C-alpha cells in the first residue's frame, strides 16, 4: 500500500483562510483535515526538494492544491499546424477552407505527433482530463477521413494511465444518405468514439443534421457535444432546435453546446429565454474565449465585439459552464499552449470576473464544471476520490491569476508525473536580500488577509 502525507495545503475553494493536512492511500484521498496552524515537520520535504514520485512526506508550504484541470473542448488533431495552414484574414471561414485543403497532406504519423505534443503540454500544465473534437471530413474520401481519428485514438491509448482523453469525431452527415459514407461514420463510432460531435450551424440544413446526430447518439448510447452557433450573427440560432431535440429525446445531461457566440449580440429577451430553456434541458455549455475573441468581430469597426458567449447569464441560469482551450497554434487560433490557467485568465478578463468570488468561479470553470460535463467519476478533492491534482506555487486564487505560476507539480492517482521549477537568481547581493525579506513578510501581510 502506497501512502502520501501532505501538510500545509491551501484549498482555496474549500477555505482560503485555512491550511489542510491530506493523506492519500493507494491513489485515493483518505483524510482531509483542517490544521489548527502552520505545521513545521523536519521529516517532510518541501516542494522545491522533491526529486521523485516516491517522496511520501511533502510540506506544501501554504501553496494551492487544485483538482487536476479538465479541458472540455480541444482539437488535438489540428494543434501546432499553423506553419502549414496559414490564415491571412483571421476568419473562421478561411481557417476551415485552408485546413480542409491541407488535410490530405497530413499523415497519421504527423497528426499523432502534434496530438501527443499538445496532450503532454496540457498534462505538464496540470490538465488531467481532455475532451478533444476530431475532424472527420467525408468529402476527403476514405483514405483521408480516418487519419485524424486514428492518430488521436493512438495517443489516447498510449497516455491512458496518465491522462483521460475523450474523443469526439465531428460528423457532417451526407445529404444524400450515402450508404458508404454512413458506414464510415458508424465505423468511426465503433473505433472508440466517446461521443457524437458536429457543427450543424455550418450545414445547409442544420435541423436535418441535428436530427441525424441525435439518432446516432441514441443508437450507440453516446453523449452529444456540438459546436453551436459559432458566429457573431444573432440570426444564427441552432440552439433553439437543439433544446427541442434534447427535451423530445430525453437527452438531459447528455448534451454539451460549445461556443454559443451568437447569444452575445442577440436581442436580450430572446437570449435570456434560450439560456433559461437550455438550463431547463440540462444542456451543458463551454466557452472558448481565446479562439472566439480571435475569430469573431472581424468585420466590426469602432466597437469590436468580443465574440464570447453570455458567461454571466449562463452561470446565473444554473447551467453548467466550462472554459476550455479550443485550438492551439493553428489557423483557428495562432496562440496558446494548452494551459488552462491562461484560458482562465482570458475568461476573467472578458467576463469581468476579477473579484475573489469571480476568480473562484473561474477555477470551477476549469475543474469542477467541466468534470461534470465529461461525466468524470471520482473527481475532486474529497475523501474517496482519485488523487489527481496540481500543486501551484501560489497562495490564493488572486495569486494564481496575477502570476500564472510556472512552478507546478502534477499528480495523477497519487503519483507525481511532472514538476516544473523556475530557475531564479539575483546577481546583486542587495537585491537578493530585499527578495528574501519580501518573502519572509508574506505571513505578516498576506497569509490571513481579509477584505475590509
PLM-predicted stretches and their roles:
Residues 1-43, 48, 360-452:
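Active-site microenvironment of metallo-dependent hydrolases
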Residues 62, 73, 126, 196, ...:
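Divalent metal-coordination and catalytic microenvironments
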Residues 147-157, 177-284, 301-323, 379:
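Histidine/acidic residue-rich metal-binding segments in metalloenzymes
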Residues 65, 82-133, 144-160, 186-189:
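Alpha-helical scaffold segments that flank or form the walls of functional sites
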Residues 98-114, 168-179, 199-203:
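Active-site mouth loops of central-metabolism enzymes
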Residues 79-111, 220, 238-256, 279-284, ...:
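Active-site gating loops and adjacent loop-to-helix segments of metal-dependent hydrolytic enzymes
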Residues 223, 244-255, 291, 295, ...:
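His/Asp/Glu-enriched, well-ordered alpha-helical/loop segment
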Amino acid at each position: 500500500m502506497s501512502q502520501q502525507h501532505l501538510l500545509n495545503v491551501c484549498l482555496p475553494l474549500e477555505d482560503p483562510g485555512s491550511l489542510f493536512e491530506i493523506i492519500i492511500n493507494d491513489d485515493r484521498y483518505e483524510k482531509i483535515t483542517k490544521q489548527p496552524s502552520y505545521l513545521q515537520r523536519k521529516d517532510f520535504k518541501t516542494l522545491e526538494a522533491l526529486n521523485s514520485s516516491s517522496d511520501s512526506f511533502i510540506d506544501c508550504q501554504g501553496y494551492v492544491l487544485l483538482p487536476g484541470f479538465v479541458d472540455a473542448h480541444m482539437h488535438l488533431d489540428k494543434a501546432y499546424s499553423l506553419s502549414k495552414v496559414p490564415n491571412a484574414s483571421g476568419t473562421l471561414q478561411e481557417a476551415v477552407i485552408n485546413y480542409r485543403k491541407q488535410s490530405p497532406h497530413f499523415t497519421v504519423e504527423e497528426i499523432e505527433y502534434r496530438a501527443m505534443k499538445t496532450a503532454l503540454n496540457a498534462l505538464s500544465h496540470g490538465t488531467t482530463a481532455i475532451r478533444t473534437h476530431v475532424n472527420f471530413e467525408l468529402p476527403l474520401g476514405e483514405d483521408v477521413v480516418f487519419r485524424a481519428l486514428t492518430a488521436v485514438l493512438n495517443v489516447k491509448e498510449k497516455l491512458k494511465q496518465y491522462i483521460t482523453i475523450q474523443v469526439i469525431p465531428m460528423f457532417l452527415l451526407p445529404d444524400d444518405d450515402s450508404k458508404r459514407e454512413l458506414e464510415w461514420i458508424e465505423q468511426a463510432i465503433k473505433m472508440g468514439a466517446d461521443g457524437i460531435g458536429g457543427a450543424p450551424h455550418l450545414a445547409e440544413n442544420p435541423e436535418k443534421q441535428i436530427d441525424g446526430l441525435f439518432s446516432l447518439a441514441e443508437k450507440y448510447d453516446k453523449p452529444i457535444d456540438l459546436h453551436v452557433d459559432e458566429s457573431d450573427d444573432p440570426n444564427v440560432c441552432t440552439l433553439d432546435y437543439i433544446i427541442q431535440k434534447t427535451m423530445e429525446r430525453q437527452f438531459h445531461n447528455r448534451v454539451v453546446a460549445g461556443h454559443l457566440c451568437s447569444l452575445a449580440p442577440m436581442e436580450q429577451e430572446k437570449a435570456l429565454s434560450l439560456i433559461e430553456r437550455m438550463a431547463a434541458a440540462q444542456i451543458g455549455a463551454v466557452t472558448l474565449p481565446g479562439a472566439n475573441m480571435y475569430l469573431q468581430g472581424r468585420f466590426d469597426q469602432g466597437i469590436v465585439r468580443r465574440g464570447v458567449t453570455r458567461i454571466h447569464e449562463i452561470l446565473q441560469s444554473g447551467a453548467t459552464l466550462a472554459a476550455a482551450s479550443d485550438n492551439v497554434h493553428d489557423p483557428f487560433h495562432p496562440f496558446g499552449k494548452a494551459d488552462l490557467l491562461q484560458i482562465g485568465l482570458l475568461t476573467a478578463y472578458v467576463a469581468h470576473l476579477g473579484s475573489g468570488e469571480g476568480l473562484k468561479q473561474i477555477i470551477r470553470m476549469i475543474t469542477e464544471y467541466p468534470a461534470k460535463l465529461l461525466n468524470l467519476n471520482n473527481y475532486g478533492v474529497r475523501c474517496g476520490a482519485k488523487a489527481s491534482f496540481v500543486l501551484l506555487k501560489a497562495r490564493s486564487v488572486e495569486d494564481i491569476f496575477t502570476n500564472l505560476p510556472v512552478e507546478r507539480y502534477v499528480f495523477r492517482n497519487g503519483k507525481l508525473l511532472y514538476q516544473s521549477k523556475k530557475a531564479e537568481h539575483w546577481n546583486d547581493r542587495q537585491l537578493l536580500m530585499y527578495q528574501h525579506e519580501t518573502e519572509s513578510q508574506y505571513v505578516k501581510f498576506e497569509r490571513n488577509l481579509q477584505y475590509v
